[in-house]
Amino acid sequence: MRKIIHIDMDCFFAAVEMRDNPALRDIPIAIGGSRERRGAISTANYPARQFGVRSAMPTAMALKLCPHLTLLPGRFDAYKEASRHVRDIFSRYTSLIEPLSLDEAWLDVTDSPHCYGSATLIAREIRQTIFNELQLTASAGVAPVKFLAKIASDLNKPNGQYVITPADVPGFLKTLPLAKIPGVGKVSAAKLENMGLRTCGDIQQCDLAMLLKRFGKFGRVLWERSQGIDERDVNSERLRKSVGVERTLAEDIHEWSDCEAIIEHLYPELERRLAIVKPDLLIARQGVKLKFNDFQQTTQEHVWPQLNKEDLITTARKTWDERRGERGVRLVGLHVTLLDPQLERQLVLGL
């Protein structure tokens, strides 16, 4: 049985800002967006969250909820440096590290000799070391599989950890809301609830063939996760291949003008996310994704060496006109595909 830890830094970007400027600690702050332009909140500290400010929230909405919110543009070099230090701490315990972003990662400590081989003690020691060396807090989840470790890391935030032992898994899953499974958004959860499916325990009673017929590949993922099945390894060779942002809509849209407005809102967040990795990697393609109300989806990409909003809008309009038919759209996404570092190096050498 594997021992997987998921580490998630608490309010990472905001925490770095508060560490470096203690005057910010007790006031509501958020990273991302500005009062002058449309954008989205990247991270908010806990004082801001008390007013309802959340990650990915439109800046205008955040300011309505918290008019005295302090908006910071973000210092990505500082965040990257802190992230590198955190990953150095991880490497003291295992070489099997799979970063998900600057502020979270999976660790496989199955064969780690540290802390008598106890994943619980390793997670606790890692969190304490992060605090001692960086004055930042982290939360952790410990479980036999990746998706449960990720869920667990969110159950005792901030600055805490939650352990799901192999013996705990059946009982934990029986009452686990389907909305907690990574990849199940609000709209999917609502559709499942309309079918009387609210928990993993409900899915356990379903026939796999029915789920496959109703939801396609997504149905198999639902069934496997509800059984506690997640055979994915912690992949230490994982490279960031793309950067994207998407929004699942509370109600389906049927007008192009609504889709265009969503793209206008998503684009600044895509710019922000790309800024984190762009200094190291080149863009190969950019594209759009539309998911329809029958759970089918389509992705359209263009070869394009730099981020370009007008091209994304043109691509989205073409996709909307050619692929939608009469179906409503329930998700809109933007993404860029990054050039493989080895190919990038070959191209540079060939110039």
From Swiss-Prot:
Mg(2+) binds at D8, D103. PANTHER family: DNA POLYMERASE KAPPA, DNA REPAIR POLYMERASE UMUC / TRANSFERASE FAMILY MEMBER. NCBIfam families: PRK02406.1 (NF002677). Residues 4-185 form the UmuC domain. It comes from the Bacteria. Keywords: Cytoplasm, DNA damage, DNA repair, DNA replication, DNA-binding, DNA-directed DNA polymerase, Magnesium, Metal-binding, Mutator protein, Nucleotidyltransferase, Transferase. Gene3D superfamilies: 3.30.70.270, 3.40.1170.60, 5' to 3' exonuclease, C-terminal subdomain (1.10.150.20), DNA polymerase, Y-family, little finger domain (3.30.1490.100). It is found in: Cytoplasm. It catalyses: DNA(n) + a 2'-deoxyribonucleoside 5'-triphosphate = DNA(n+1) + diphosphate. The record marks F13 as: Substrate discrimination. Pfam families: IMS, IMS_C, IMS_HHH_1. Its EC number is 2.7.7.7. Coiled coil: none annotated. Its main location: cytoplasm. Its cofactor is Mg(2+). This is DNA polymerase IV. Binds 2 magnesium ions per subunit. One of its GO terms (biological process) is error-prone translesion synthesis. GO terms for molecular function: damaged DNA binding; DNA-directed DNA polymerase activity; magnesium ion binding. It is an enzyme of class 2 (transferase). Belongs to the DNA polymerase type-Y family. Monomer. Poorly processive, error-prone DNA polymerase involved in untargeted mutagenesis. Copies undamaged DNA at stalled replication forks, which arise in vivo from mismatched or misaligned primer ends. These misaligned primers can be extended by PolIV. Exhibits no 3'-5' exonuclease (proofreading) activity. May be involved in translesional synthesis, in conjunction with the beta clamp from PolIII.
